[in-house]
Amino acid sequence: MIYIFDFDGTLVDSMPTWSGVHVNALKSAAIPVPDDFVQTITPLGNYRASQYTISLGLDVSLESYLDFVSKTLYEAYTTRIELRSGVKEKLSELKAAGHSLNVLTASPHHYLDPCLRRHGIYDLFDKVWTIEDFGYTKAQTIIYTEAAQRLDASIDRCVFVDDNATAVETAKKTGMYTVGIFDETSKDFAPQLKAVSDLYIEDFSQIPSL
């Protein structure tokens, strides 16, 4: 089978840091944070997430805000962000079983790749992609169909694993088998994630070898 993994909140325990940059920017400016803010920005990537955050009322240029976000996250991902429990062991198990492992994330290569290398799992993946490699967000079905095409795989042989309900629901629309994984940051949306997933799990070790 072809496994396609999200990164933030799925492989690494990073969502409090990643979303926190934007949440704290709004709070520091005394701007109310929408209830669905984290769920909304998660599939978008840094650029569109920054655009959306600024649109809520931040008095800052997009260029300066992007620079702030980039520097803050680079430091965190290259030094502090840790793998979720059981990730390395499960990935190694799936790889040994002959499955193709891949990453598709909204996070950019400049801190995605160093983080995967720091934890010694980069070479387990056949492809490590960000949405920048496609020009689409994870809220668009075309990114999943194109990923399957690039992997020379039929959609029904693809297993997509993500903690975001929007991304999971979108991937499922293409015919991929979807695994929703619980993440504490988006616990309020766990019922929604469970509803749109073919399989819902709470721990990475529960990912099946299909």
Model-derived regions: residue spans:
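N-terminal helical cap/lid subdomain that shapes the substrate entry/recognition surface
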Residues: 1-93, 97
